[in-house]
Amino acid sequence: MITTVKFAKTKPNAIIPTKRLEDAGYDVYPCFDEDYMIIKPHTTVIIPTGIASACDTDYCFVLHERSSTGTKGMAQRCGIIDSGYRGEWGVPITNTNDVPIVICKKESITDFNDFASILLFPYGEANYILYPYEKAICQALVLPVPEVEIEKYTYEELKAILSERGTDRLGSSGK
């Protein structure tokens, strides 16, 4: 059975997420009115996408970093889009670099470069990372959400359930 995923534009210039047959996730694109958006070093900004969605209640969307954003120091933060959420998707991106990241529209790059050194003066002349507005900023996986029953146990009862790891913590597997 094929599940239908529904997307809608919340802004006219938004791009509906795209996916090739062999890709796991849908590419999600930025959508903002300004010519560019700056993400200062070591800060997180929610990037608007101009899209909303709906899907069956037994699915959700999970946002993940793309390799093209990760190599630029753009870390995609948490991102679960529940089946019942109908608002615009916002993608939290953290700049892990010591210089600003500028998501810039193609037609604005020439103008942007003219005043970039003034705008970004504290970080040094023309010392920034340019990310094209036309590229996807994350990918969205459609994952099943199983319906489960919860059973309550005392902590002692829970620890008594067989487990290879038990209560051992980080690094305990030796892998």
Model-derived regions, located:
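DUTPase catalytic domain/fold
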Residues: 1-175
